[in-house]
Regions:
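Acidic, glycine-rich active-site loops and adjacent beta-strand->loop/helix elements
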Residues: 11, 54-61, 82-84, 165-167
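Residues forming anionic-ligand binding surfaces in small-molecule and nucleic-acid pockets
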Residues: 1-24
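Active-site loop ensemble at the mouth of alpha/beta enzyme cores that anchors a bound cofactor
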Residues: 74, 91-106
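Alpha-helical metal-binding/catalytic segments enriched in His/Glu/Asp
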Residues: 16-59, 183-190
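A glycine-rich helix N-cap at a beta->alpha junction
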Residues: 68-88
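Active-site-adjacent substrate-binding region
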Residues: 99-101, 105-184, 190-195
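Alpha-helix C-terminal capping segments
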Residues: 39-43, 70-72, 150-155
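Short, well-ordered secondary-structure micro-motifs
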Residues: 62-66, 87-92, 147-148, 171-172
Length: 197
């Protein structure tokens, strides 16, 4: 009954820039970033046990995150995601909340949770200390795995940090590699400076 088809998408660096175009960046970027975080942390002394989870069924009920929280029993949650970049043709400048190359994005609130105030403040202070640009957004039309994890047990302090990405959920997404590198630097610094308590 019909012919199966798939998009013919390949990885591209855009015209000598640091912008990258590829498929399925939501949330391959998060998985790739976590791998790089673990590599960076292996040579840095810190008191924390760090877990990374590539979950399933986020878009249909945060199901994998719920299971992961029950298995891991986390003390905090740093959800690493894409953030919808709004610097696209056709939008007025005042409507642009998140832009490529502007730094990682700290989500203040989405439809599934409000980021923990103390953890948010710690990330903002760490970004200032490390001279890392940081953008902010709200996303009232969707949520992330943090929306399930923050409700685990007595509650888990949670935030969402995203890499600005254009055209998520399409055949090609676009992100700026500087944002990726800055997210990596920020998250490594945050994890390193968190105490074990």
């Amino acid at each position: 009954p019909g012919d199966p088809i798939i998009p013919d998408t390949t990885f591209h660096v855009l015209n000598g820039t640091r912008m990258i175009m590829a498929k399925a960046l939501d949330d391959r970027l998060g998985c790739c970033l976590f791998i790089d975080i673990i590599k960076a942390l292996q040579d840095i002394p810190h008191p924390n046990t760090v877990y990374g989870v590539g979950t399933v069924q986020e878009e249909v009920g945060l199901r994998g995150a719920t299971t992961a929280a029950n298995v891991i029993e986390p003390d905090i949650c740093l959800t690493v995601e894409v953030a919808i970049a709004t610097d696209v043709p056709g939008l007025e400048k005042e409507d642009v909340e998140v832009k490529l190359g502007g730094g990682p994005v700290l989500t203040l609130a989405d439809a599934s949770m409000i980021g923990n105030r103390n953890l948010r403040s710690f990330i903002i202070e760490t970004a200032k200390k490390e001279n890392i640009p940081l953008q902010f957004n709200t996303m009232m039309g969707g949520g992330t795995d943090g929306g399930a994890i923050h409700k685990f047990g007595p509650g888990v302090p949670a935030v969402v940090l995203g890499i600005p990405t254009r055209y998520i959920h399409s055949h090609y997404g676009v992100f700026h590699y500087d944002d990726y590198e800055n997210a990596l630097k920020l998250l490594v610094s945050v994890i390193k400076d968190l105490d074990a308590g």
